[in-house]
Amino acid sequence: MNYQLITTDDGLSEVCSQARRMPQVALDTEFVRTRTYYPQLGLIQLFDGERLSLIDPLSITVWQPFCDLLLDPAVTKYLHAGSEDLEVFLNAFGLLPTPFVDTQILVAFLGKPLSYGFAALVADYMQVTLDKSESRTDWLARPLSEKQCQYAAADVYYLLPMAIRLVEETTSAGWWEAALDECRQLCQRKQDVLAPEQAYREIGNAWQLKGRHLACLQKLADWRLRKARERDSAVNFIVREEHLGQVARYLPGSLGELGALGLSGPEIRYHGKTLLELVAETQTMDAAEYPEPVINLIDYPGYKKAFREIKDLVQQQAERSGLSAELLASRRQINRLLSWHWKLAPQTHVPELLSGWRGRLFGEPLKGILANYI
């Protein structure tokens, strides 16, 4: 397939200007995320139905034309399994494409598995077998090989015609508005940024700690997340999660004690002093300053029975609607609903199972179940 490699600001401006004359475009990104907190953008693929462009972010400095395209309300942006691509756009440009449609969400409303891959979709709709051998390539290395470019180009070349068909099929099936709603919810999830002071709640065994020990974990997790974002490093490359838990549990007072708890040499060398300072700060806190204990949801009274009732309702709705139970409600969504209902976690948005298309489909009977679990 023919493509052009865009390496200049003028070239980007020209292809974005043309793309904005079209009603829809297909987008994809290639990125690297091994030791970093944020994804490192390596390539952007853009197909407007006439011109296929591979945009090299390493050589472009003026991104306003591309941002204007992403925000153009007259141009629908199609991606497949776009969750990580949205994160890339947020990190690189501080915005999300709109209007945005994820074709993986569309096929889920047409009866395919929730994580239906792009290669399988192309095989189904285009009778083409994609070469996925470049999927683990280093997209930050230059120059890009012809094989890399062909691999990247295929992702949008086949996506656009399939997307148009999938919109028609989803509309005919009566699920178009629900699918759009699900795409909006995906965007909302990507914009919900974890507050550092709440990071301790994401630590696996936080529910085992109380009082001063939990206060210490809160300080440690807050510091680690801020440091990871500041240095653009994966959090476990700062200090491993299990080591944070050990420090909070035993409240060490020396570098030697950190080593005895299993912390690595680099962790102690680079961060040992800071960890000990945070432990010392905890020792001077008043009990009134300690965070509330983290409740282990699965041990909460009534959890197992409530979860089972909700799963039964979801299965009934799946059979009635023709949608998969997996699409209707994941375990994570059910757990968030119950945590919200019992006020076990900070209250933010209304849970997804009670809002949007899910709320319209089975929100009332779901509220009926929740009413039995005060």
Curated annotation (Swiss-Prot):
Q: Where in the cell is it found?
A: Cytoplasm
Q: Look up the signal peptide feature and give its range.
A: none
Taxonomic source organism:
Musicola paradisiaca (strain Ech703) (Dickeya paradisiaca)
Instruction: State the function annotated in the UniProt record.
Output: Exonuclease involved in the 3' processing of various precursor tRNAs. Initiates hydrolysis at the 3'-terminus of an RNA molecule and releases 5'-mononucleotides.
One GO molecular function term? 3'-5' exonuclease activity
EC annotation from Swiss-Prot or TrEMBL? 3.1.13.5
Cofactor annotation: a divalent metal cation
Q: Which NCBIfam families match?
A: PRK10829.1, rnd
Reactions this protein catalyses: Exonucleolytic cleavage that removes extra residues from the 3'-terminus of tRNA to produce 5'-mononucleotides
Q: Record's family?
A: Belongs to the RNase D family.
One Pfam family per UniProt: HRDC
Q: Which UniProt keywords apply?
A: Cytoplasm, Exonuclease, Hydrolase, Nuclease, tRNA processing
Its recorded name reads: Ribonuclease D
3'-5' exonuclease domain location: 3-171
A GO biological process of this protein is: tRNA 3'-end processing
Question: Residues in domain HRDC?
Answer: 210-289
**Any one of the GO CC terms:** cytoplasm
Q: Does the keyword Cytoplasm apply?
A: yes
Q: Which InterPro entries match?
A: 3'-5'_exonuclease_dom, HRDC-like_sf, HRDC_dom, HRDC_dom_sf, RNase_D, RNase_D-like, RNAseD_HRDC_C, RNaseH-like_sf
